[in-house]
Amino acid sequence: MIYIGLPQWSHPKWVRLGITSLEEYARHFNCVEGNTTLYALPKPEVVLRWREQTTDDFRFCFKFPATISHQAALRHCDDLVTEFLTRMSPLAPRIGQYWLQLPATFGPRELPALWHFLDSLPGEFNYGVEVRHPQFFAKGEEEQTLNRGLHQRGVNRVILDSRPVHAARPHSEAIRDAQRKKPKVPVHAVLTATNPLIRFIGSDDMTQNRELFQVWLQKLAQWHQTTTPYLFLHTPDIAQAPELVHTLWEDLRKTLPEIGAVPAIPQQSSLF
C-alpha cells in the first residue's frame, strides 16, 4: 500500500477543478498532510465534520502543534499533548501518523528531550519526526544517534526533498517565498520505521520536477515491498499541486501499478 496526497485539501483555485471540500478531495486522494494543526487546534465540531467527510481507508498525517514542537521545545507539555490527541480522537482510526516538525534550533543537545517526548506518547499511533538542524544531515555521530534512536522507537524520519524549489529560477513571488521558507537540506532517504513520509517540494517547472523525482521511483518501489510509504506533493503556489500530480502520476504508475489511474482532476489549462 502507498498513500499519495497534497499538503492541504482545499484552495480557492481548486474550486474550478471541482475540489470544494475535504469530501471531494478524498475522492481523488487517500491521504492529506495536516498542516493546519501546527498553527491551531480545530474546534471539536470541525473534527467531527472531517470524520463525516472521509471514509475509513483515508489517512490524515497531522503535525503536532507548534505550541509543543517550537514554543515548549517538547518539554513540560504533557497537557498540550493530551489536549491535542483528545481533540483529534474522533479521527483516531484514520490517523496515518502524527509528526513533529522541529525547528532548526532543535539540535543534538536536545535529543534527550525528543526521546523523553516520544517515549511518553500512546502506543496505538505511528509517529514521524522532521529535523532541520544541520548536524542531523552531516552523516556524523549526531545523525547516526538520531537515526538509531528513531529506529529503536519505531518512529519515522520524515524526509524533505526541497531540491526542485531551490533549483528553480526565482522569477515569481511564490518561488521566492518558498525558497526563503523551505529548508535547503540534503536529502537523506533513511528508513527508520514502517511508514516513511516523503515531502517532495516541487517548483513551477514541471519538466524539472519530473527529472528530480526519478530517484524516488526506485526508492518507493523498494520501500513499498516492506513498508507503507506516504508521499506528499508540494508546489510553491499550492494551486499548482494538482498539475504536479498529473506530471508525476504516470511514472509512479509504471513503478507502482496498484495506484491506478491518475486522479480525474481537470488540469488548469483545460478550463480556459
Swiss-Prot record:
PANTHER family hit by this protein: UNCHARACTERIZED PROTEIN YECE, UPF0759 PROTEIN YECE
NCBIfam families (UniProt xref): PRK10302.1
Pfam families registered for this protein in UniProt: DUF72
Record protein name field: UPF0759 protein YecE
InterPro entries associated with the record: DUF72, UPF0759_sf
Family per record: Belongs to the UPF0759 family.
